[in-house]
Amino acid sequence: MKLLKAIRDADALRPNQLSTPRKAEILMVLEHRIAEMMGAEAPTLKVSVEDDTASVEDMELLLPDGHNECYHLYLAAQLDAYNQDSALYSNDHAIANEAVADAMAWWRRENRKESKGNWKV
């Protein structure tokens, strides 16, 4: 999934006035968590988040297509927090965290280290 598509999907869920660079910065927080779990280098945002009129470079996000709902759910929850809508934030945050946990569990299952066969009981 691309960064700007995740932002567009979240905007469809929660119309808002937050600038695209700020939304990209919010998504980079999640992307850093995912990169740390994968042992990959976290991507960096190549735009100043202070400049609300700056255009954001589109980049490929780390999670594959089967788990890309994590991004727009996470961003929607953070938009609820920004708008101080605590009732929506609680629900959306729980749903987003569950989606992220499922994606991380899937990644760990698919990318296990080879077992050396040494078991101690």
List each language-model region with its residue ranges:
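Short loop/turn elements at secondary-structure junctions
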Residues: 12-21, 66-68, 72-121
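Conserved short "hinge" loops at termini or chain/domain junctions
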Residues: 1-59, 104-121
